[in-house]
């Protein structure tokens, strides 16, 4: 561990799943050796550095009210550097959820001006930031998210033969994830072409159950304890999100040797590469077309293996990139 350096992770919601998963990455031995990591809830009071080399890493989602927190960290925090990870905002989020966009972008410009580096969690997110001049290009660093997937990397890979395409999807039942679009697409797909199982829970559960009513080739399942069993019979994993900063579901699917059928949006663009099947975001008809393409593809097994090979190295790349960033003087 580097002597006399604290790395303070600043949050305002300790229950956010994506953020808590990101924090686990800093337990990796190489990152743990970069300093003493501490997690602090900014709602409990002002946050101050205790040494000249301390670094603050901001995980909370910026808005107009929270600019005061960033201003206090900048002017009075005493940190050598402040790094903000953009877990939330993307081009897809802006297109789906934001009006007026001009005011939203101005808020982000002010927030990013108050920190030393902005970490985008995908290359596509970084490109969106640069395109709209939210911060200088040399201030924005892309460090794509990942997780340890040893359990999934050792699963038997996709072995599609004949019969209906076995599609799996999982995640929070929320508008963001686009499962309503996926079920509507399945209503246009015959049962002898594809079947779908969706696992999860969330505020849109009743809506999804209603959409799936009468569709014998669509099953809504409770959350699972282990993805291995849920994915064991999968030919591919669908990720029809309206927005997705990165999308760890894609990492897990690819590590399991399953290609993804995903919206061409935000961080999912980074994961489609040559192994996935892309569709237009928010488009039921485009999802239908992607299902037909994947069901008729003769190389799904090869696509799965290619996707796994890439996923296998992404975690180590992420750790290396974070070590390089934290090592900067």
Q: Which residues fall in each region the model found?
A:
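Membrane-proximal helix-turn-helix segments that form the acceptor-binding/catalytic region
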Residues: 100-118
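Nucleotide-activated donor-binding/catalytic signature segment of Leloir-type glycosyltransferases, i.e.
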Residues: 209-224
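A charged, aromatic-enriched C-terminal amphipathic alpha-helix characteristic of glycosyltransferases
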Residues: 18, 296-329
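Aromatic "clamp/platform" in nucleotide-sugar-dependent glycosyltransferases that forms part
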Residues: 242
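Short hydrophobic beta-strand element within catalytic cores of glycosyltransferases
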Residues: 259-262
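Conserved donor-binding/catalytic core segment of Leloir-type glycosyltransferases
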Residues: 159-177, 183-186
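Conserved acidic donor-binding segment of nucleotide-sugar-dependent glycosyltransferases
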Residues: 274-285, 292-298
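A short, active-site helix/loop in glycosyltransferases that binds the activated sugar's phosphate group
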Residues: 113-139
């Amino acid at each position: 561990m580097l002597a006399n350096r604290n790395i303070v992770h600043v949050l305002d919601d300790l229950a956010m799943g994506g953020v808590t998963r990101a924090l686990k990455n800093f337990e990796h031995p190489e990152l743990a050796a970069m300093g003493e990591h501490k997690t602090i809830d900014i709602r409990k009071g002002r946050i101050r550095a205790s040494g000249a080399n301390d670094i603050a890493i901001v995980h909370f989602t910026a808005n107009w009210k929270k600019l005061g927190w960033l201003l206090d960290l900048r002017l009075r925090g005493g940190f050598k550097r402040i790094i903000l990870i953009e877990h939330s905002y993307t081009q897809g989020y802006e297109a789906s959820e934001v009006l007026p966009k001009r005011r939203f972008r101005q808020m982000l410009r002010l927030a990013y001006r108050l920190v030393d580096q902005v970490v985008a969690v995908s290359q596509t997110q970084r490109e969106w930031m640069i395109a709209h001049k939210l911060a200088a290009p040399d201030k924005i660093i892309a460090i794509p998210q990942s997780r340890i997937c040893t359990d999934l990397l050792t699963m038997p890979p996709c072995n599609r033969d004949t019969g209906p395409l076995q599609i799996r999807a999982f995640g929070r039942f929320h508008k963001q994830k686009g499962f309503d679009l996926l079920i509507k697409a399945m209503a246009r797909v015959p049962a002898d072409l594809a079947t779908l199982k969706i696992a999860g829970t969330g505020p849109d559960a009743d809506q999804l159950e209603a959409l799936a009513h009468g569709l014998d080739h669509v099953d809504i399942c409770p959350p699972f304890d282990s993805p291995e069993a849920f994915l064991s019979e999968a030919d591919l994993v669908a990720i029809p999100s309206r927005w997705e900063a990165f999308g760890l579901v894609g990492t897990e699917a690819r590590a399991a040797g399953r290609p993804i059928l995903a919206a061409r949006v935000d961080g999912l663009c980074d994961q489609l590469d040559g192994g996935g099947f892309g569709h237009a975001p928010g488009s039921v008809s485009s999802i239908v077309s992607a299902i037909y393409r994947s069901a008729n593809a003769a190389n799904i097994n090869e696509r799965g293996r290619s996707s796994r090979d890439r996923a296998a190295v992404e975690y180590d790349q992420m750790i290396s990139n974070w070590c390089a960033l934290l090592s900067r003087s």
